[in-house]
Amino acid sequence: KVDGEYKRFAFTEDGISPRSRLGLDNGVFWNTGDESDEFGHITEDPQVRIQMMDKRMSRLDLVTKRVPDDEQVVSFGVHDYTIISWGSTKGPILDAISILKKEGINIGFIQIKLIHPFPSDYVKSLLKNAKTIIDIEANHSGQLGKIFKQNVLREIDYFILKYTGRGMTSTEIYDSLKKIVENNANKREVLSHGA
């Protein structure tokens, strides 16, 4: 039971407001797409807007403090050649680097799981000995590569991208990585395998 009026968006020390559970007495609140006060009522008051935005942004610091490094970024080893990626590319990347390892070619891989706030210091520490950074993504523009460059202040050496709407395969990643290791690759490799 909530005593008094429930403030769904109450200002708190850590920036996280208490949540109501279904059926909680006096736990009714409003959600809007516009700025709201602590009760969820729409407001255009500039001071409330400033307080609410400051509250939201304070959570970014909280995330950095509370989420362990190994949950922000997963390292599958770092070598001279190291891949950065995110999302659905993980499986085919691990398969491709496993095949390459059997051929005596070691390629590292770090999977970025937290994009904002970007774990810059941790990523920098992981990649300090990597000589070549390869960005593998399922989009046209290499979005993670841009975020990486902005936060880590380091260039991506090679992009392997696929944006056909089909998933990447370990075979096409393997082929692209092999070209990079053999110094026979374009800076931007666009994949198109798949029916």
Can you describe what each PLM-predicted range is?
Residues 1-195:
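Flexible, low-complexity linker and terminal segments
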